[in-house]
Amino acid sequence: MHEIGYSKTYEITVTKDMVQKYAEVTGDFNPIHVDEDFAKSTKFGKCIAHGMLIGGFFSRALVDTFGGSGIYLGQDLKFTNPVFVGDTILVQMTLIGLRKEKLIGTVETTAKRKSNGDVCVKGQAVIMMAPPR
């Protein structure tokens, strides 16, 4: 069983293919994500990844950090900076609360741009951890 303060970081590089597949699966073809000519005309100057694509990395990181048979009970997210295609993101999970008797954990979730440390997505997740074996 992990203790409060336990933290793990994962590195993920966002690719154009990831953004395209996310658009296809969700139907979110907002041109800021998939149309480079349109994106050049925006304040960002280039395509940005879907915020929820980055949020989805938290789900993967929670499984890798706390075990594959745990259950995701909730997640809140704030999108604080754009993530661009080609950015490498550091996805960090930190256990900040734990109800051991119920195996319920509260996890701080943060996605930072590796190149400059900008926090791009942050929030908290509540998970039911897998029982120890």
Q: Which stretches of residues belong to each language-model region?
A:
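Hydrophobic beta-strand-centered segment that forms part of the acyl-chain substrate-binding groove
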Residues: T42-K46, G56-L95
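Secondary-structure boundary/capping positions in well-ordered alpha/beta enzyme cores
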Residues: F29, G68-S69, D118
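Short, conserved phosphate/pyrophosphate- and ester-handling motifs at nucleotide-, phospho-/glycolipid
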Residues: G51
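HotDog/MaoC-like acyl-thioester-processing domains
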Residues: M1-S7, V83-R133
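Short amphipathic alpha-helical segments
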Residues: Q20, G55-G56
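Catalytic strand-loop segment that frames the active site of acyl-thioester-processing enzymes
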Residues: M1-C47
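Generic detection of short hydrophobic beta-strand segments and adjacent strand-loop junctions
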Residues: K8-V14, L77, A125-I127
